Amino acid sequence: MLATIDPIALRLGPISIHWYAICIVSGLLLAVYLAQRLAPEKGINPEHILDFILLAFPIAIVGARLYYVIFQWSYYSQNPSEIFAIWNGGIAIYGGLIAGAAVLYWFAKRHAIAVLDFLDIAAPGVMIAQSIGRWGNFVNQEAYGKAVSQLNYLPEIIRQQMFINGSYRVPTFLYESLWNLVGFSIILGLRYFNKGLRQGDVTSFYLIWYGLGRFVIEGMRTDSLMFVGLRVSQWVSISIIILGAVLLYFRKQRQKADYKMKN
């Protein structure tokens, strides 16, 4: 039987580099690379992408941590010294997305960039970054599901890491990682095979796809807050699914109106 993975990947004297941080930074770098490659298609200066990331990333991390702490307040109110111990894990993707979206809106308006264009080039990278980032949860043994008798369909290294508190746990991190990877692949396929994508289509797909997957997978977890019969993140998922559907509908209606005006 394999030992569990040490959350610390590398120690350099007093400095410890965690796998969690490596996963987040790796996803971020890939997201930046993709967005910079896509930016010229929308007439956006690729340098704006790096400027945006340097501003948005720390704010998104704070938002993700704040979201997590708020919904785990019963624990952190008793352990206030751990509120800032982000290296131990404990950030909520939705908190980061909300904070990041707010910064994106402000940044786009400041630089006279269409918000939907900015979102369209950001969405593919965000999705693959989320896929990679979930492996940080894997190493930290968090964001898992209910106890099960066995996980024989998985490689030994994943089975062992999902043996938590005396039981195997449903690897919800893996399900979400794969779901996001599939979504990323679909976006690439849509971009390659469908040259008629409208402004906002990629953003709508991201919101609906990610929201659906997160809603289902969140229902398998056992470590998140309940509210009116559902987990808080499931309510947020419903909200972003509706947002994506509404955006898709109104963009379609606008396209029809533009077509009638031209004819």
UniProtKB/Swiss-Prot annotation:
<dbReference type="GO" id="GO:0005886">
    <property type="term" value="C:plasma membrane"/>
</dbReference>
<feature type="transmembrane region" description="Helical">
    <location>
        <begin position="112"/>
        <end position="132"/>
    </location>
</feature>
<feature type="transmembrane region" description="Helical">
    <location>
        <begin position="15"/>
        <end position="35"/>
    </location>
</feature>
<comment type="similarity">
    <text>Belongs to the Lgt family.</text>
</comment>
<keyword id="KW-1003">Cell membrane</keyword>
<comment type="function">
    <text>Catalyzes the transfer of the diacylglyceryl group from phosphatidylglycerol to the sulfhydryl group of the N-terminal cysteine of a prolipoprotein, the first step in the formation of mature lipoproteins.</text>
</comment>
<feature type="transmembrane region" description="Helical">
    <location>
        <begin position="200"/>
        <end position="220"/>
    </location>
</feature>
<dbReference type="GO" id="GO:0008961">
    <property type="term" value="F:phosphatidylglycerol-prolipoprotein diacylglyceryl transferase activity"/>
</dbReference>
<feature type="binding site">
    <location>
        <position position="134"/>
    </location>
    <ligand>
        <name>a 1,2-diacyl-sn-glycero-3-phospho-(1'-sn-glycerol)</name>
    </ligand>
</feature>
<keyword id="KW-0472">Membrane</keyword>
<feature type="transmembrane region" description="Helical">
    <location>
        <begin position="227"/>
        <end position="247"/>
    </location>
</feature>
<dbReference type="InterPro" id="IPR001640">
    <property type="entry name" value="Lgt"/>
</dbReference>
<keyword id="KW-1133">Transmembrane helix</keyword>
<feature type="transmembrane region" description="Helical">
    <location>
        <begin position="52"/>
        <end position="72"/>
    </location>
</feature>
<protein>
    <recommendedName>
        <fullName>Phosphatidylglycerol--prolipoprotein diacylglyceryl transferase</fullName>
        <ecNumber>2.5.1.145</ecNumber>
    </recommendedName>
</protein>
<dbReference type="Pfam" id="PF01790">
    <property type="entry name" value="LGT"/>
</dbReference>
<dbReference type="GO" id="GO:0042158">
    <property type="term" value="P:lipoprotein biosynthetic process"/>
</dbReference>
<feature type="transmembrane region" description="Helical">
    <location>
        <begin position="83"/>
        <end position="103"/>
    </location>
</feature>
<keyword id="KW-0812">Transmembrane</keyword>
<comment type="pathway">
    <text>Protein modification; lipoprotein biosynthesis (diacylglyceryl transfer).</text>
</comment>
<feature type="transmembrane region" description="Helical">
    <location>
        <begin position="170"/>
        <end position="190"/>
    </location>
</feature>
<keyword id="KW-0808">Transferase</keyword>
